């Protein structure tokens, strides 16, 4: 089902002229709720009887089924660091490196590394085709990260990143004031 959905999204992206889509590794589905998952910093118990090795195998198998559509359409799948097996740069890079295709790269979400964030940005930046820059004005719903966007911009410059920077606002402040502040913050950092 997820493979079919991803292929449909690749085809829709092609029809709309969108060069990349965000994909993720999925989760084990063992948390009671997303709130519970966030309380555990995105770490979720495995399904009983299965290992991370099983999970990585399923992820690889799924993406390999999507590769022909991505190549045919010229749409890159950007694997986001987003919980589950993709919670760390090492997990995302393991999938990317094992598949070893120009049609599977990374979507770097600055708000999804809850530990050693700058070291993980540095690891993932060379594979990034899209960056989702999170801001938390007014405090975040589940957590708030202090992100030094001047430092992030420097990491991306060193990796020769030339793609889009997408704002992802997750704060509680009214969007009418927070989004302009967020855009100004990002413009200052990335135009330096």
Which residues are covered by each model-predicted region?
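Histidine-acidic metal/acid-base catalytic patches
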Residues: 17-20, 64, 72, 86-192
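Active-site acidic/histidine proton-transfer and metal-coordination neighborhood
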Residues: 1-105
């Amino acid at each position: 089902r997820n493979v079919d959905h991803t292929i449909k999204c690749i085809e829709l992206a092609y029809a709309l002229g969108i060069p990349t889509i965000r994909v993720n590794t999925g989760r084990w589905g063992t948390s009671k709720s997303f709130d519970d998952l966030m309380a555990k910093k995105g770490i979720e118990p495995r399904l009983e009887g299965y290992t991370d090795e099983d999970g990585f195998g399923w992820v690889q198998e799924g993406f390999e089924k999507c590769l022909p559509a991505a190549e045919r359409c010229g749409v890159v799948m950007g694997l986001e660091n987003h919980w589950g097996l993709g919670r760390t740069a090492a997990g995302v890079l393991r999938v990317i490196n094992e598949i070893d295709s120009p049609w599977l790269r990374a979507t770097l979400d600055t708000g999804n590394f809850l530990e050693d964030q700058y070291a993980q940005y540095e690891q993932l930046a060379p594979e990034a085709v899209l960056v989702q820059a999170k801001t938390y004005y007014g405090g975040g719903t589940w957590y708030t990260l202090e992100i030094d966007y001047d430092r992030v911009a420097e990491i991306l410059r060193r990796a020769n990143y030339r793609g889009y920077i997408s704002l992802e606002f997750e704060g509680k402040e009214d969007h009418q004031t927070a989004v302009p502040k967020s855009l100004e913050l990002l413009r200052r950092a990335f135009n330096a």
